[in-house]
Protein backbone atom coordinates (compact mmCIF):
# COMPACT_ATOMS: atom_id res chain seq x y z
CA UNK A 1 0.00 0.00 0.00
CA UNK A 2 2.83 2.29 0.79
CA UNK A 3 4.44 1.47 -2.47
CA UNK A 4 1.41 2.70 -4.43
CA UNK A 5 1.28 6.01 -2.58
CA UNK A 6 4.83 6.98 -3.38
CA UNK A 7 4.41 7.18 -7.18
CA UNK A 8 1.31 9.30 -6.71
CA UNK A 9 3.16 11.67 -4.43
CA UNK A 10 5.91 11.94 -6.95
CA UNK A 11 3.41 12.75 -9.67
CA UNK A 12 1.86 15.47 -7.46
CA UNK A 13 5.22 16.89 -6.71
CA UNK A 14 6.08 17.12 -10.36
CA UNK A 15 2.73 18.80 -11.14
CA UNK A 16 3.17 21.44 -8.43
CA UNK A 17 6.66 22.09 -9.60
CA UNK A 18 5.45 22.77 -13.13
CA UNK A 19 2.74 25.12 -11.84
CA UNK A 20 5.22 27.06 -9.81
CA UNK A 21 7.49 27.30 -12.78
CA UNK A 22 4.59 28.67 -14.78
CA UNK A 23 4.12 31.35 -12.14
CA UNK A 24 7.74 32.37 -12.41
CA UNK A 25 9.19 30.64 -9.40
CA UNK A 26 12.34 28.61 -9.56
CA UNK A 27 12.83 25.67 -7.30
CA UNK A 28 15.95 25.58 -5.34
CA UNK A 29 17.48 22.90 -3.31
CA UNK A 30 16.39 24.60 -0.08
CA UNK A 31 12.92 24.99 -1.37
CA UNK A 32 12.66 21.32 -2.20
CA UNK A 33 13.88 20.38 1.23
CA UNK A 34 11.44 22.84 2.80
CA UNK A 35 8.58 21.46 0.81
CA UNK A 36 9.56 18.10 1.83
CA UNK A 37 9.52 19.16 5.44
CA UNK A 38 6.29 21.17 5.61
CA UNK A 39 4.23 19.26 3.21
CA UNK A 40 2.94 20.03 -0.16
CA UNK A 41 -0.56 21.34 0.76
CA UNK A 42 0.39 24.24 2.95
CA UNK A 43 3.10 25.29 0.56
CA UNK A 44 0.73 25.44 -2.36
CA UNK A 45 -1.68 27.70 -0.45
CA UNK A 46 1.07 30.07 0.52
CA UNK A 47 2.39 30.26 -2.95
CA UNK A 48 -1.04 30.95 -4.39
CA UNK A 49 -1.65 33.73 -1.87
CA UNK A 50 1.67 35.28 -2.68
CA UNK A 51 0.94 35.10 -6.42
CA UNK A 52 -2.45 36.80 -6.03
CA UNK A 53 -0.94 39.58 -3.96
CA UNK A 54 1.77 40.11 -6.54
CA UNK A 55 -0.77 40.31 -9.38
CA UNK A 56 -2.92 42.75 -7.43
CA UNK A 57 0.10 44.89 -6.75
CA UNK A 58 0.92 44.98 -10.44
CA UNK A 59 -2.65 46.01 -11.34
CA UNK A 60 -2.73 48.72 -8.67
CA UNK A 61 0.56 50.08 -9.92
CA UNK A 62 -0.97 50.41 -13.41
CA UNK A 63 -3.98 52.55 -12.23
CA UNK A 64 -2.16 55.93 -11.99
CA UNK A 65 -0.79 55.53 -15.49
CA UNK A 66 -4.28 54.88 -16.90
CA UNK A 67 -5.67 57.93 -15.06
CA UNK A 68 -2.90 60.12 -16.43
CA UNK A 69 -3.58 58.79 -19.93
CA UNK A 70 -7.29 59.64 -19.58
CA UNK A 71 -6.41 63.14 -18.36
CA UNK A 72 -4.04 63.56 -21.29
CA UNK A 73 -6.78 62.44 -23.66
CA UNK A 74 -9.24 64.97 -22.17
CA UNK A 75 -6.64 67.73 -22.46
CA UNK A 76 -6.11 66.85 -26.10
CA UNK A 77 -9.86 66.92 -26.76
CA UNK A 78 -10.16 70.34 -25.03
CA UNK A 79 -7.30 71.73 -27.11
CA UNK A 80 -8.94 70.46 -30.28
CA UNK A 81 -12.24 72.08 -29.29
CA UNK A 82 -10.46 75.37 -28.55
CA UNK A 83 -8.74 75.32 -31.93
CA UNK A 84 -12.02 74.50 -33.64
CA UNK A 85 -13.77 77.39 -31.89
CA UNK A 86 -10.97 79.75 -32.93
CA UNK A 87 -11.18 78.50 -36.51
CA UNK A 88 -14.94 79.07 -36.53
CA UNK A 89 -14.45 82.59 -35.19
CA UNK A 90 -11.95 83.21 -37.98
CA UNK A 91 -14.35 82.17 -40.71
CA UNK A 92 -14.34 84.65 -43.58
CA UNK A 93 -17.25 86.91 -44.35
CA UNK A 94 -17.93 84.78 -47.36
CA UNK A 95 -18.48 81.74 -45.16
CA UNK A 96 -20.88 83.67 -42.94
CA UNK A 97 -22.77 84.88 -45.96
CA UNK A 98 -22.97 81.35 -47.24
CA UNK A 99 -24.42 80.23 -43.93
CA UNK A 100 -26.96 83.05 -44.04
CA UNK A 101 -27.80 82.13 -47.62
CA UNK A 102 -28.31 78.52 -46.60
CA UNK A 103 -30.59 79.61 -43.76
CA UNK A 104 -32.60 81.75 -46.15
CA UNK A 105 -32.80 78.91 -48.64
CA UNK A 106 -34.12 76.61 -45.96
CA UNK A 107 -36.60 79.26 -44.83
CA UNK A 108 -37.77 79.76 -48.40
CA UNK A 109 -38.22 76.03 -48.80
CA UNK A 110 -40.19 75.92 -45.57
CA UNK A 111 -42.41 78.78 -46.71
CA UNK A 112 -42.98 77.14 -50.08
CA UNK A 113 -44.12 74.02 -48.28
CA UNK A 114 -46.86 75.92 -46.48
CA UNK A 115 -50.32 74.85 -47.53
CA UNK A 116 -51.95 77.11 -50.08
CA UNK A 117 -54.83 77.73 -47.76
CA UNK A 118 -52.47 79.13 -45.11
CA UNK A 119 -50.98 81.57 -47.63
CA UNK A 120 -54.38 82.77 -48.69
CA UNK A 121 -55.40 83.27 -45.08
CA UNK A 122 -52.29 85.34 -44.38
CA UNK A 123 -52.90 87.47 -47.48
CA UNK A 124 -56.52 87.93 -46.48
CA UNK A 125 -55.48 89.01 -42.99
CA UNK A 126 -52.97 91.50 -44.39
CA UNK A 127 -55.61 92.98 -46.69
CA UNK A 128 -58.07 93.18 -43.82
CA UNK A 129 -55.56 95.02 -41.64
CA UNK A 130 -54.65 97.38 -44.51
CA UNK A 131 -58.31 98.14 -45.16
CA UNK A 132 -58.84 98.87 -41.47
CA UNK A 133 -55.80 101.16 -41.38
CA UNK A 134 -57.02 103.07 -44.45
CA UNK A 135 -60.49 103.44 -42.99
CA UNK A 136 -58.96 104.89 -39.81
CA UNK A 137 -57.14 107.68 -41.67
CA UNK A 138 -58.25 111.20 -40.62
CA UNK A 139 -60.59 112.95 -43.01
CA UNK A 140 -57.92 115.48 -43.97
CA UNK A 141 -55.53 112.96 -45.46
CA UNK A 142 -52.82 113.98 -47.93
CA UNK A 143 -55.01 113.72 -51.00
CA UNK A 144 -57.80 115.59 -49.31
CA UNK A 145 -55.39 118.31 -48.21
CA UNK A 146 -54.02 118.63 -51.75
CA UNK A 147 -57.54 118.81 -53.12
CA UNK A 148 -58.48 121.48 -50.60
CA UNK A 149 -55.32 123.44 -51.42
CA UNK A 150 -56.17 123.33 -55.11
CA UNK A 151 -59.74 124.39 -54.37
CA UNK A 152 -58.54 127.30 -52.25
CA UNK A 153 -56.01 128.29 -54.90
CA UNK A 154 -58.69 128.23 -57.57
CA UNK A 155 -60.95 130.37 -55.38
CA UNK A 156 -58.10 132.80 -54.70
CA UNK A 157 -57.37 133.11 -58.42
CA UNK A 158 -61.03 133.74 -59.16
CA UNK A 159 -61.10 136.41 -56.44
CA UNK A 160 -58.10 138.32 -57.75
CA UNK A 161 -58.72 142.07 -57.93
CA UNK A 162 -59.25 143.66 -61.30
CA UNK A 163 -55.71 144.99 -61.25
CA UNK A 164 -54.20 141.53 -61.65
CA UNK A 165 -50.76 140.90 -63.06
CA UNK A 166 -51.84 141.08 -66.68
CA UNK A 167 -53.77 144.25 -66.02
CA UNK A 168 -50.77 145.76 -64.26
CA UNK A 169 -48.57 144.83 -67.19
CA UNK A 170 -51.09 146.33 -69.57
CA UNK A 171 -51.18 149.54 -67.53
CA UNK A 172 -47.39 149.65 -67.45
CA UNK A 173 -47.30 149.26 -71.21
CA UNK A 174 -49.90 151.99 -71.58
CA UNK A 175 -47.90 154.35 -69.38
CA UNK A 176 -44.74 153.43 -71.25
CA UNK A 177 -46.43 154.14 -74.55
CA UNK A 178 -47.58 157.52 -73.23
CA UNK A 179 -44.08 158.26 -71.98
CA UNK A 180 -42.60 157.33 -75.34
CA UNK A 181 -45.10 159.59 -77.01
CA UNK A 182 -43.88 162.43 -74.80
CA UNK A 183 -40.24 161.93 -75.64
CA UNK A 184 -38.54 165.04 -76.99
CA UNK A 185 -37.62 163.05 -80.07
CA UNK A 186 -41.01 164.02 -81.39
CA UNK A 187 -38.94 166.72 -82.86
CA UNK A 188 -39.24 169.11 -85.73
CA UNK A 189 -40.51 166.70 -88.38
CA UNK A 190 -43.28 165.40 -86.11
CA UNK A 191 -44.26 168.91 -85.11
CA UNK A 192 -44.23 170.06 -88.73
CA UNK A 193 -46.35 167.08 -89.71
CA UNK A 194 -48.83 167.88 -86.95
CA UNK A 195 -48.92 171.54 -87.98
CA UNK A 196 -49.51 170.60 -91.60
CA UNK A 197 -52.25 168.23 -90.53
CA UNK A 198 -53.97 170.96 -88.52
CA UNK A 199 -53.46 173.44 -91.36
CA UNK A 200 -54.97 171.02 -93.85
CA UNK A 201 -57.96 170.51 -91.57
CA UNK A 202 -58.36 174.25 -91.20
CA UNK A 203 -58.14 174.77 -94.96
CA UNK A 204 -60.75 172.09 -95.52
CA UNK A 205 -63.08 173.91 -93.17
CA UNK A 206 -62.71 177.27 -94.91
CA UNK A 207 -65.52 178.45 -97.17
CA UNK A 208 -64.63 177.88 -100.78
CA UNK A 209 -64.36 181.56 -101.65
CA UNK A 210 -61.99 182.61 -98.93
CA UNK A 211 -59.71 179.56 -99.01
CA UNK A 212 -57.34 180.81 -101.69
CA UNK A 213 -57.21 184.30 -100.26
CA UNK A 214 -56.35 183.16 -96.76
CA UNK A 215 -53.78 180.73 -98.05
CA UNK A 216 -52.19 183.49 -100.05
CA UNK A 217 -52.13 185.76 -97.02
CA UNK A 218 -50.63 183.07 -94.87
CA UNK A 219 -47.91 182.41 -97.41
CA UNK A 220 -47.18 186.11 -97.72
CA UNK A 221 -46.86 186.52 -93.97
CA UNK A 222 -44.69 183.43 -93.75
CA UNK A 223 -42.39 184.70 -96.47
CA UNK A 224 -42.06 188.03 -94.71
CA UNK A 225 -41.33 186.36 -91.39
CA UNK A 226 -38.67 184.18 -92.95
CA UNK A 227 -37.07 187.16 -94.57
CA UNK A 228 -36.91 188.95 -91.23
CA UNK A 229 -35.14 186.10 -89.41
CA UNK A 230 -31.57 186.92 -88.35
CA UNK A 231 -28.84 184.76 -89.82
CA UNK A 232 -28.29 182.97 -86.49
CA UNK A 233 -31.83 181.89 -85.84
CA UNK A 234 -32.72 179.92 -82.78
CA UNK A 235 -32.29 176.55 -84.45
CA UNK A 236 -28.96 177.55 -85.88
CA UNK A 237 -27.79 178.78 -82.51
CA UNK A 238 -28.83 175.57 -80.83
CA UNK A 239 -27.06 173.53 -83.50
CA UNK A 240 -23.91 175.56 -83.12
CA UNK A 241 -24.01 175.21 -79.35
CA UNK A 242 -24.36 171.47 -79.65
CA UNK A 243 -21.50 171.30 -82.14
CA UNK A 244 -19.25 173.27 -79.82
CA UNK A 245 -20.23 171.20 -76.81
CA UNK A 246 -19.52 167.99 -78.70
CA UNK A 247 -16.09 169.24 -79.70
CA UNK A 248 -15.36 170.25 -76.10
CA UNK A 249 -16.39 166.85 -74.78
CA UNK A 250 -14.15 165.12 -77.31
CA UNK A 251 -11.24 167.24 -76.12
CA UNK A 252 -11.88 166.37 -72.48
CA UNK A 253 -9.46 164.05 -70.66
CA UNK A 254 -11.15 160.81 -69.60
CA UNK A 255 -9.19 159.48 -66.59
CA UNK A 256 -11.56 156.49 -66.32
CA UNK A 257 -13.45 154.47 -68.94
CA UNK A 258 -17.17 154.93 -69.28
CA UNK A 259 -19.16 153.26 -66.47
CA UNK A 260 -16.14 153.42 -64.16
CA UNK A 261 -16.00 155.69 -61.09
CA UNK A 262 -13.05 157.99 -60.34
CA UNK A 263 -11.77 158.36 -56.77
CA UNK A 264 -8.41 159.67 -55.57
CA UNK A 265 -6.46 158.82 -58.70
CA UNK A 266 -8.03 155.39 -59.25
CA UNK A 267 -10.88 154.01 -61.32
CA UNK A 268 -13.41 151.52 -59.91
CA UNK A 269 -15.84 149.26 -61.72
CA UNK A 270 -18.75 147.69 -59.84
CA UNK A 271 -20.15 144.75 -61.78
CA UNK A 272 -23.80 144.22 -62.64
CA UNK A 273 -23.42 140.43 -62.91
CA UNK A 274 -22.16 137.81 -60.45
CA UNK A 275 -19.24 135.39 -60.48
CA UNK A 276 -17.30 133.34 -57.96
CA UNK A 277 -14.18 134.80 -56.39
CA UNK A 278 -11.65 133.25 -58.79
CA UNK A 279 -13.66 134.21 -61.90
CA UNK A 280 -13.99 137.75 -60.53
CA UNK A 281 -10.19 137.98 -60.49
CA UNK A 282 -10.12 136.86 -64.13
CA UNK A 283 -12.82 139.37 -65.11
CA UNK A 284 -10.78 142.24 -63.67
CA UNK A 285 -7.59 141.04 -65.35
CA UNK A 286 -9.37 140.99 -68.72
CA UNK A 287 -9.91 144.77 -68.51
CA UNK A 288 -6.41 145.57 -67.26
CA UNK A 289 -7.40 145.83 -63.59
CA UNK A 290 -7.39 143.67 -60.45
CA UNK A 291 -9.93 142.67 -57.86
CA UNK A 292 -9.94 145.66 -55.54
CA UNK A 293 -7.10 146.01 -53.02
CA UNK A 294 -7.85 148.58 -50.31
CA UNK A 295 -4.95 150.82 -49.28
CA UNK A 296 -6.51 153.50 -47.07
CA UNK A 297 -9.38 154.20 -44.71
CA UNK A 298 -10.77 156.78 -47.17
CA UNK A 299 -10.81 154.21 -49.94
CA UNK A 300 -12.50 151.67 -47.63
CA UNK A 301 -15.23 154.17 -46.68
CA UNK A 302 -15.80 155.06 -50.34
CA UNK A 303 -16.10 151.43 -51.45
CA UNK A 304 -18.22 150.40 -48.46
CA UNK A 305 -20.63 153.22 -49.29
CA UNK A 306 -20.86 152.12 -52.93
CA UNK A 307 -21.60 148.53 -51.89
CA UNK A 308 -24.12 149.35 -49.15
CA UNK A 309 -26.04 151.72 -51.43
CA UNK A 310 -26.68 148.92 -53.90
CA UNK A 311 -27.37 146.45 -51.04
CA UNK A 312 -25.12 143.85 -52.66
CA UNK A 313 -22.64 141.26 -51.46
CA UNK A 314 -19.48 142.19 -53.37
CA UNK A 315 -16.12 140.41 -53.63
CA UNK A 316 -12.87 142.18 -52.77
CA UNK A 317 -9.34 140.92 -53.47
CA UNK A 318 -8.74 139.47 -49.98
CA UNK A 319 -8.49 135.79 -48.91
CA UNK A 320 -6.76 133.34 -46.56
CA UNK A 321 -6.53 130.54 -49.14
CA UNK A 322 -2.77 130.13 -48.74
CA UNK A 323 -2.88 129.73 -44.96
CA UNK A 324 -5.96 129.60 -42.77
CA UNK A 325 -6.27 132.74 -40.64
CA UNK A 326 -3.59 134.68 -42.56
CA UNK A 327 -5.44 137.15 -44.79
CA UNK A 328 -3.66 138.42 -47.87
CA UNK A 329 -4.54 140.70 -50.78
CA UNK A 330 -4.33 139.49 -54.38
CA UNK A 331 -1.23 141.65 -54.92
CA UNK A 332 0.57 139.64 -52.22
CA UNK A 333 0.44 142.28 -49.49
CA UNK A 334 -0.79 141.23 -46.02
CA UNK A 335 -3.86 142.63 -44.32
CA UNK A 336 -2.74 145.40 -41.98
CA UNK A 337 -3.86 145.14 -38.34
CA UNK A 338 -5.58 148.53 -38.63
CA UNK A 339 -7.94 147.09 -41.26
CA UNK A 340 -9.23 144.30 -39.00
CA UNK A 341 -11.71 146.77 -37.53
CA UNK A 342 -13.74 146.57 -40.74
CA UNK A 343 -14.80 142.95 -40.16
CA UNK A 344 -18.40 142.55 -39.06
CA UNK A 345 -18.91 141.32 -35.50
CA UNK A 346 -17.92 137.68 -35.14
CA UNK A 347 -16.13 137.64 -38.51
CA UNK A 348 -14.13 136.07 -39.98
CA UNK A 349 -15.45 132.77 -38.58
CA UNK A 350 -14.49 130.28 -41.33
CA UNK A 351 -17.83 128.47 -41.14
CA UNK A 352 -17.75 125.77 -43.82
CA UNK A 353 -14.34 126.72 -45.26
CA UNK A 354 -15.05 130.44 -45.82
CA UNK A 355 -11.78 131.76 -47.24
CA UNK A 356 -12.71 134.83 -49.35
CA UNK A 357 -13.72 138.33 -48.17
CA UNK A 358 -16.71 140.36 -49.32
CA UNK A 359 -18.40 143.68 -48.61
CA UNK A 360 -21.48 142.79 -46.56
CA UNK A 361 -23.75 145.40 -45.01
CA UNK A 362 -21.59 147.94 -43.22
CA UNK A 363 -18.45 145.82 -43.04
CA UNK A 364 -16.59 142.74 -44.22
CA UNK A 365 -17.54 139.07 -44.10
CA UNK A 366 -15.80 135.82 -45.06
CA UNK A 367 -17.68 133.45 -47.34
CA UNK A 368 -17.15 130.41 -49.56
CA UNK A 369 -15.06 131.31 -52.60
CA UNK A 370 -17.20 129.26 -55.01
CA UNK A 371 -20.32 131.38 -54.44
CA UNK A 372 -21.40 133.85 -57.14
CA UNK A 373 -21.37 137.52 -56.08
CA UNK A 374 -20.81 140.96 -57.57
CA UNK A 375 -17.24 142.25 -57.68
CA UNK A 376 -15.22 145.51 -57.80
CA UNK A 377 -12.26 146.07 -60.13
CA UNK A 378 -9.62 148.73 -59.54
CA UNK A 379 -6.98 150.31 -61.76
CA UNK A 380 -5.02 153.56 -61.88
CA UNK A 381 -6.65 156.53 -63.59
CA UNK A 382 -5.18 157.92 -66.81
CA UNK A 383 -3.16 161.13 -66.45
CA UNK A 384 -4.36 164.33 -68.13
CA UNK A 385 -2.14 167.03 -69.67
CA UNK A 386 -1.79 170.43 -68.02
CA UNK A 387 -3.95 172.13 -70.63
CA UNK A 388 -6.67 169.54 -70.16
CA UNK A 389 -6.54 169.97 -66.39
CA UNK A 390 -6.96 173.70 -66.82
CA UNK A 391 -9.82 173.08 -69.20
CA UNK A 392 -11.50 170.76 -66.70
CA UNK A 393 -11.03 173.09 -63.73
CA UNK A 394 -13.44 176.03 -63.42
CA UNK A 395 -12.01 179.23 -64.92
CA UNK A 396 -11.71 182.23 -62.57
CA UNK A 397 -13.75 185.32 -63.29
CA UNK A 398 -11.71 187.79 -65.35
CA UNK A 399 -12.47 191.31 -66.48
CA UNK A 400 -13.24 191.95 -70.08
CA UNK A 401 -10.11 191.79 -72.21
CA UNK A 402 -8.64 195.16 -73.13
CA UNK A 403 -9.50 196.48 -76.54
CA UNK A 404 -7.12 195.50 -79.23
From Swiss-Prot:
Homotetramer. Interacts with C1QBP; the interaction is indicative for a C1q:C1QBP:CD209 signaling complex. Interacts with ICAM2 and ICAM3 by binding to mannose-like carbohydrates. Interacts (via C-type lectin domain) with CEACAM1 (via Lewis X moieties); this interaction is regulated by the glycosylation pattern of CEACAM1 on cell types and regulates contact between dendritic cells and neutrophils. It comes from Pongo pygmaeus (Bornean orangutan). InterPro entries: C-type_lectin-like (IPR001304), C-type_lectin-like/link_sf (IPR016186), C-type_lectin/snaclec_domain (IPR050111), C-type_lectin_CS (IPR018378), CD209-like_CTLD (IPR033989), CTDL_fold (IPR016187). A motif (Endocytosis signal) lies at residues 14-15, 16-18, 31-34. Residues 96-257 are annotated as: 7 X approximate tandem repeats. Disulfide bonds join 256-267, 284-377, 356-369. GO terms for molecular function: D-mannose binding; metal ion binding. It is found in: Membrane. The keyword Transmembrane helix applies. Keywords: Adaptive immunity, Calcium, Cell adhesion, Disulfide bond, Endocytosis, Glycoprotein, Immunity, Innate immunity, Lectin, Mannose-binding, Membrane, Metal-binding, Receptor, Repeat, Signal-anchor, Transmembrane, Transmembrane helix. Glycans are attached at residue 80. Sequence repeats lie at residues 96-118, 119-141, 142-164, 165-187, 188-210, 211-233, 234-257. The chain crosses the membrane at residues 38-58. This is CD209 antigen. GO terms for cellular component: membrane. It comes from the Eukaryota. It is a single-pass type II membrane protein. Residues 1-37 are cytoplasmic.
Amino acid sequence: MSDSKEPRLQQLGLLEEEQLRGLGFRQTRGYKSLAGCLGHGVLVLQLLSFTLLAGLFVQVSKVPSSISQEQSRQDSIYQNLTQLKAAVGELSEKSKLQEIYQELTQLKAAVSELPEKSKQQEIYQELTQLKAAVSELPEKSKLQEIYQELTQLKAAVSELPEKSKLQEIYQELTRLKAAVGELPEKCKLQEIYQELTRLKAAVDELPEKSKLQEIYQELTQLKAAVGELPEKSRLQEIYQELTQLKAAVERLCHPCPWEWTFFQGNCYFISNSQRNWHDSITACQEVGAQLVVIKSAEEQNFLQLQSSRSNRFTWMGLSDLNQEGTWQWVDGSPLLPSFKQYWNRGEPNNVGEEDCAEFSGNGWNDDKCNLAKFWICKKSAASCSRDEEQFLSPAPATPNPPPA
